[in-house]
Amino acid sequence: MSNNPFLEERLPIAVRLGASYNDEYAVEVTKTASGQEHRKLIHPFPVRRFSVHYTKSKGEIYDQILALYHRAYGKFKGFRVQAMDDYSTNGATGTPTAFDQPLSRLSAGVYQLYKVYGSTGAARTIFKPVAGTTVVAKNGVIVESGVTVNTTTGQVTISPPPLITNVITGGCLFDIPCRFDGEIDVTPLSPNYAETGEIMLVELINP
Protein backbone atom coordinates (compact mmCIF):
# COMPACT_ATOMS: atom_id res chain seq x y z
CA MET A 1 0.00 0.00 0.00
CA SER A 2 1.10 3.56 -0.67
CA ASN A 3 1.12 6.57 1.60
CA ASN A 4 -1.23 8.51 -0.66
CA PRO A 5 -4.00 10.29 1.30
CA PHE A 6 -7.43 8.66 1.25
CA LEU A 7 -10.85 9.58 2.62
CA GLU A 8 -12.68 6.51 3.92
CA GLU A 9 -16.05 7.71 2.63
CA ARG A 10 -18.20 6.81 -0.34
CA LEU A 11 -19.39 8.96 -3.22
CA PRO A 12 -23.12 9.68 -2.64
CA ILE A 13 -25.50 7.03 -3.99
CA ALA A 14 -27.47 9.46 -6.17
CA VAL A 15 -24.29 10.16 -8.11
CA ARG A 16 -23.50 6.49 -8.60
CA LEU A 17 -26.89 5.88 -10.20
CA GLY A 18 -26.05 8.34 -12.95
CA ALA A 19 -22.54 7.12 -13.69
CA SER A 20 -21.12 5.43 -16.78
CA TYR A 21 -17.72 3.76 -16.77
CA ASN A 22 -15.14 1.78 -18.67
CA ASP A 23 -12.11 -0.33 -17.79
CA GLU A 24 -8.79 0.28 -19.47
CA TYR A 25 -5.37 -1.40 -19.38
CA ALA A 26 -1.95 0.22 -19.39
CA VAL A 27 -0.63 -0.93 -22.76
CA GLU A 28 2.31 0.75 -24.47
CA VAL A 29 2.05 0.48 -28.27
CA THR A 30 5.10 1.24 -30.41
CA LYS A 31 4.99 1.28 -34.20
CA THR A 32 8.04 0.75 -36.37
CA ALA A 33 8.74 2.57 -39.62
CA SER A 34 7.46 -0.48 -41.49
CA GLY A 35 4.12 -0.30 -39.67
CA GLN A 36 4.65 -3.26 -37.34
CA GLU A 37 3.31 -2.97 -33.80
CA HIS A 38 5.06 -3.91 -30.57
CA ARG A 39 2.80 -3.97 -27.52
CA LYS A 40 3.91 -3.96 -23.89
CA LEU A 41 1.59 -4.52 -20.93
CA ILE A 42 2.75 -2.08 -18.25
CA HIS A 43 0.75 -3.81 -15.49
CA PRO A 44 -2.05 -6.41 -15.54
CA PHE A 45 -4.64 -4.53 -13.48
CA PRO A 46 -7.76 -2.94 -14.99
CA VAL A 47 -8.21 0.76 -14.25
CA ARG A 48 -11.80 1.95 -14.18
CA ARG A 49 -12.82 5.45 -15.26
CA PHE A 50 -16.21 6.88 -14.32
CA SER A 51 -18.09 9.71 -15.99
CA VAL A 52 -20.76 11.26 -13.77
CA HIS A 53 -23.41 13.88 -14.55
CA TYR A 54 -25.44 15.15 -11.62
CA THR A 55 -28.68 17.18 -11.55
CA LYS A 56 -30.08 17.93 -8.10
CA SER A 57 -31.01 20.72 -5.76
CA LYS A 58 -28.26 23.24 -5.17
CA GLY A 59 -28.10 22.17 -1.53
CA GLU A 60 -27.46 18.53 -2.46
CA ILE A 61 -24.80 19.45 -5.01
CA TYR A 62 -23.01 21.73 -2.57
CA ASP A 63 -23.38 19.46 0.47
CA GLN A 64 -22.62 16.14 -1.24
CA ILE A 65 -20.52 16.66 -4.35
CA LEU A 66 -18.65 19.91 -3.91
CA ALA A 67 -18.10 19.23 -0.22
CA LEU A 68 -16.39 15.92 -1.06
CA TYR A 69 -14.42 17.60 -3.86
CA HIS A 70 -13.07 20.19 -1.45
CA ARG A 71 -12.37 17.65 1.33
CA ALA A 72 -10.39 15.69 -1.25
CA TYR A 73 -8.59 18.83 -2.47
CA GLY A 74 -9.58 17.93 -6.01
CA LYS A 75 -7.26 15.23 -7.35
CA PHE A 76 -5.26 14.96 -4.11
CA LYS A 77 -7.22 12.50 -1.94
CA GLY A 78 -8.96 9.30 -2.90
CA PHE A 79 -12.39 8.06 -1.79
CA ARG A 80 -14.70 5.07 -2.26
CA VAL A 81 -16.98 4.51 -5.25
CA GLN A 82 -19.42 1.62 -5.60
CA ALA A 83 -20.15 0.58 -9.18
CA MET A 84 -23.83 -0.27 -9.34
CA ASP A 85 -23.28 -3.45 -11.38
CA ASP A 86 -19.89 -4.62 -10.04
CA TYR A 87 -19.59 -4.57 -6.26
CA SER A 88 -19.45 -8.23 -5.25
CA THR A 89 -16.94 -11.07 -5.56
CA ASN A 90 -19.88 -13.38 -6.32
CA GLY A 91 -20.57 -12.57 -9.95
CA ALA A 92 -21.30 -8.87 -10.17
CA THR A 93 -23.90 -8.17 -7.49
CA GLY A 94 -24.55 -11.51 -5.76
CA THR A 95 -24.34 -12.21 -2.05
CA PRO A 96 -20.67 -12.97 -1.33
CA THR A 97 -19.66 -16.45 -0.19
CA ALA A 98 -16.50 -17.82 1.36
CA PHE A 99 -15.75 -19.72 -1.86
CA ASP A 100 -15.93 -16.88 -4.41
CA GLN A 101 -12.28 -16.09 -5.08
CA PRO A 102 -8.80 -17.39 -4.19
CA LEU A 103 -6.95 -15.15 -1.75
CA SER A 104 -3.33 -14.22 -2.41
CA ARG A 105 -0.92 -15.09 0.40
CA LEU A 106 1.21 -12.09 1.41
CA SER A 107 2.90 -13.56 4.48
CA ALA A 108 2.18 -16.11 7.20
CA GLY A 109 -1.52 -15.76 8.00
CA VAL A 110 -2.01 -12.60 5.89
CA TYR A 111 -3.94 -12.66 2.59
CA GLN A 112 -5.14 -10.13 0.02
CA LEU A 113 -8.69 -9.99 -1.33
CA TYR A 114 -9.03 -10.15 -5.12
CA LYS A 115 -11.67 -10.47 -7.79
CA VAL A 116 -10.82 -12.38 -10.97
CA TYR A 117 -12.82 -11.56 -14.10
CA GLY A 118 -13.46 -14.74 -16.06
CA SER A 119 -11.70 -18.08 -15.70
CA THR A 120 -8.35 -16.70 -16.90
CA GLY A 121 -9.08 -12.99 -16.88
CA ALA A 122 -7.47 -10.06 -15.14
CA ALA A 123 -7.69 -9.60 -11.39
CA ARG A 124 -8.79 -6.50 -9.51
CA THR A 125 -7.15 -6.06 -6.12
CA ILE A 126 -9.85 -5.35 -3.55
CA PHE A 127 -8.42 -2.64 -1.33
CA LYS A 128 -11.75 -1.41 0.06
CA PRO A 129 -14.06 -4.24 1.21
CA VAL A 130 -17.33 -3.18 2.80
CA ALA A 131 -17.23 -3.67 6.56
CA GLY A 132 -18.95 -6.79 7.84
CA THR A 133 -19.27 -8.53 4.46
CA THR A 134 -16.06 -10.59 4.20
CA VAL A 135 -16.28 -14.37 4.62
CA VAL A 136 -13.34 -16.78 4.37
CA ALA A 137 -12.83 -20.53 3.90
CA LYS A 138 -9.85 -22.84 4.35
CA ASN A 139 -9.70 -25.97 2.21
CA GLY A 140 -13.42 -25.62 1.47
CA VAL A 141 -14.50 -25.14 5.10
CA ILE A 142 -15.74 -21.76 6.34
CA VAL A 143 -13.46 -20.21 8.95
CA GLU A 144 -15.74 -19.16 11.80
CA SER A 145 -13.22 -17.46 14.09
CA GLY A 146 -9.76 -15.93 14.12
CA VAL A 147 -10.36 -13.82 11.00
CA THR A 148 -9.56 -10.10 11.00
CA VAL A 149 -10.30 -7.90 7.99
CA ASN A 150 -8.61 -4.56 7.36
CA THR A 151 -11.25 -2.61 5.42
CA THR A 152 -8.72 0.07 4.42
CA THR A 153 -6.30 -2.33 2.69
CA GLY A 154 -8.34 -5.45 1.85
CA GLN A 155 -5.92 -7.62 3.80
CA VAL A 156 -7.27 -10.58 5.76
CA THR A 157 -5.41 -12.00 8.77
CA ILE A 158 -6.15 -15.56 9.91
CA SER A 159 -5.03 -16.74 13.34
CA PRO A 160 -3.50 -19.22 13.84
CA PRO A 161 -1.82 -18.93 10.42
CA PRO A 162 -2.86 -21.63 7.93
CA LEU A 163 -0.25 -23.90 6.40
CA ILE A 164 1.29 -22.61 3.18
CA THR A 165 -0.31 -25.57 1.39
CA ASN A 166 -3.83 -24.70 2.58
CA VAL A 167 -6.20 -23.24 -0.01
CA ILE A 168 -7.72 -19.98 1.23
CA THR A 169 -10.75 -18.50 -0.50
CA GLY A 170 -13.05 -15.64 0.34
CA GLY A 171 -15.65 -13.16 -0.75
CA CYS A 172 -17.00 -9.71 0.10
CA LEU A 173 -18.80 -6.64 -1.12
CA PHE A 174 -16.38 -3.92 -2.14
CA ASP A 175 -15.91 -0.32 -3.20
CA ILE A 176 -13.43 0.90 -5.83
CA PRO A 177 -10.86 3.46 -4.64
CA CYS A 178 -10.99 6.52 -6.89
CA ARG A 179 -10.04 10.18 -7.10
CA PHE A 180 -11.37 13.14 -9.02
CA ASP A 181 -9.68 13.50 -12.40
CA GLY A 182 -10.69 17.07 -13.18
CA GLU A 183 -12.55 20.11 -11.96
CA ILE A 184 -16.29 20.29 -11.27
CA ASP A 185 -18.37 22.80 -13.23
CA VAL A 186 -21.76 23.78 -11.80
CA THR A 187 -24.53 25.43 -13.85
CA PRO A 188 -27.57 26.92 -12.04
CA LEU A 189 -30.85 25.81 -13.66
CA SER A 190 -33.22 27.70 -11.37
CA PRO A 191 -33.11 29.39 -7.97
CA ASN A 192 -33.18 25.94 -6.34
CA TYR A 193 -31.66 23.50 -8.83
CA ALA A 194 -28.33 23.10 -10.59
CA GLU A 195 -26.41 20.58 -12.63
CA THR A 196 -22.79 19.64 -12.84
CA GLY A 197 -20.76 19.19 -15.96
CA GLU A 198 -19.05 15.87 -16.61
CA ILE A 199 -17.30 14.70 -13.44
CA MET A 200 -14.41 12.37 -14.22
CA LEU A 201 -13.22 9.81 -11.67
CA VAL A 202 -10.31 7.40 -12.05
CA GLU A 203 -9.57 4.21 -10.12
CA LEU A 204 -6.50 4.11 -7.89
CA ILE A 205 -4.36 0.98 -8.09
CA ASN A 206 -2.17 2.20 -5.21
CA PRO A 207 -4.59 3.85 -2.77
What are these model-derived regions, one by one?
Residues 66-146, 173-207:
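Extended beta-strand solenoid/passenger and fiber regions
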Residues 1-27:
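Polar/acidic, low-complexity leader/linker segments enriched in S/T/G and N/D
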Residues 141-166:
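A surface-exposed beta-strand-loop module
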Residues 3, 33-38, 94-97:
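Surface-exposed ligand/attachment interfaces on beta-rich extracellular proteins
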Residues 27-30, 167:
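Long, contiguous binding/interaction regions
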Residues 31, 38-58, 186-207:
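Oligomerization/assembly interface segments of phage tail-like spikes and tubes
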Residues 59-65:
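Short, conserved charged micro-motifs
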Residues 56, 115-119, 157-164, 205:
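Secondary-structure transition/turn motif
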